[in-house]
């Protein structure tokens, strides 16, 4: 059957020798097979962002890269009238199955794929009392693992965004992958997208304080902002130690904390805040202004409901995440290091629709894991950020009180080498 995938594979193999060339340094005797398990496959959903990178390829360092793994099956939990999966299946020659198990077994009686792409984002699911959308990532993961157990074989699993809205389930997912011995990767595109400037947190840096300024809603964009923070913080001296306490603030409480004296534990560093705004490419301006630093009065006028998450790490390091809708529409980071007088600061660059190339940066890392059997960075990062979101939303719902988080004592070491895109 001649379809788009077969044409691309043949053309790519002729042009680049993909049939015999090593992929990420590992020679392949045959092309690997990928199952997509997703909640929704509609325009601008995460399946559209990410799964389709394995159908049509993606730009990689100035070339169009065709992954050496084929989507051979899919399970789509919710399929409204604008579901794209039937059309994509016809175009690229894969099958959409009615259950997760059938997708992993490709309609047979044994697992018949080499990797699983789990995307539990978008779709119509209920909210809990803390404002968390109850995406069935844990339930879908459990169905995947059930096939692994029954068939006596595992594969790498990539999980998009949070592991779960419930920390106990998120931890169980990570523990299960470790117990069964399969590689697992998860999280946001923010840690692996381009940065402006292209800087990395020095490995084993002594961080005194850090700040992320971002935008968007809680339970969605706060996760991306926390992943932005965590990919830098985990490189500090001693490695990641986990989070001891979190306090979420909103409205006037945020402005009061921002007015606290410099160096006070009641707020955060104005110098870091200025560094973040100075890196932003979307800083709001008054009518007829070109590019001016906003006054406190302007910020209060433009940002109707600021949100702050104040984070205390087990080792005593402090960090803050700010959602400042109306002031910025990007993600910036700044940190005070013992080794330098000026803050280390950067913007995490997100290319716009329709190409949203930052998702290709994430899928390149997923592809590396699928091909090599080794996760490029620790899944524990996303275990921690998943728990941070839950704790912060519980703090917001509980009167903005500081919450001790003994469950979030997630310690781990990340690799020295960077994984974000530079060119």
Where would I find each of the regions flagged by the language model?
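An acidic- and aromatic-residue-enriched active-site/binding cleft used to recognize and process polar
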Residues: 34, 121, 162, 187-190, ...
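Phosphate/oxyanion-binding active-site loops and adjacent basic polyanion-contact surfaces
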Residues: 46-47, 133-141, 186-188, 221-222, ...
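A contiguous active-site-proximal alpha/beta segment in oxidoreductase catalytic domains
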Residues: 142, 152-233
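Contiguous beta-strand/loop segments that form the cofactor/metal-binding neighborhood of enzyme cores
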Residues: 211-214, 224-353, 360-380, 389-392, ...
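A contiguous, mid-protein "functional segment" used to position or interact
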Residues: 386-404
């Amino acid at each position: 059957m001649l379809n788009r995938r077969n044409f691309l594979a043949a053309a790519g193999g002729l042009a680049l020798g993909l049939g015999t060339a090593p992929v990420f340094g590992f020679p392949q005797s045959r092309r690997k097979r990928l199952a997509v398990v997703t909640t929704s496959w509609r325009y601008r959903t995460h399946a559209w962002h990410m799964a389709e990178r394995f159908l049509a390829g993606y730009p990689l360092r100035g070339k169009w890269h065709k992954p050496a793994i084929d989507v051979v099956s899919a399970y789509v939990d919710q399929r409204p009238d604008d579901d794209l999966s039937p059309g994509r299946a016809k175009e690229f020659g894969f099958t959409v199955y009615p259950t997760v198990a059938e997708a992993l077994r490709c309609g047979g009686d044994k697992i018949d794929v080499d990797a699983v792409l789990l995307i539990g984002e978008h779709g119509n699911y209920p909210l809990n009392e803390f404002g968390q959308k109850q995406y069935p990532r844990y339930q879908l993961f459990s169905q995947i693992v059930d096939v692994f157990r029954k068939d006596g074989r595992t594969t790498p699993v990539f999980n998009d965004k949070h592991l779960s809205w419930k920390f106990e389930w998120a931890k169980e997912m990570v523990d299960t992958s470790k117990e069964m011995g399969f590689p697992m990767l998860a999280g946001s595109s923010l840690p692996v997208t381009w940065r402006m400037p292209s800087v990395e947190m020095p490995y084993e840096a002594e961080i005194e304080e850090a700040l992320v300024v971002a935008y968007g809603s809680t339970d969605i964009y706060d996760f991306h902002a926390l992943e932005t923070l965590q990919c830098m913080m985990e490189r500090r001296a001693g490695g990641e130690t986990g989070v001891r306490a979190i306090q979420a603030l909103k409205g006037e409480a945020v402005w009061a904390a921002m007015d606290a004296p410099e160096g006070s534990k009641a707020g955060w560093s104005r110098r870091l805040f200025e560094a973040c705004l100075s890196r932003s490419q979307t800083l709001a301006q008054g009518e007829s202004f070109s590019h001016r630093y906003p006054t406190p009065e302007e910020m209060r006028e433009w940002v109707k409901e600021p949100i702050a998450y104040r984070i205390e790490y087990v080792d005593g390091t402090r960090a803050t995440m700010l959602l400042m809708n109306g002031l910025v529409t990007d993600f910036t980071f700044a940190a005070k290091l013992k080794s330098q007088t000026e803050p280390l600061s950067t913007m995490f660059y997100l290319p716009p629709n329709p190409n949203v190339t930052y998702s290709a940066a994430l899928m390149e890392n997923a592809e590396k894991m699928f091909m090599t059997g080794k996760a490029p960075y620790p899944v524990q990062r996303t275990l921690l950020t998943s728990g941070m979101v839950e704790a912060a939303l519980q703090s917001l719902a509980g009167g903005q009180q500081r919450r001790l988080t003994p469950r979030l004592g997630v310690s781990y070491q990340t690799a020295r080498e960077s994984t974000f895109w530079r060119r």
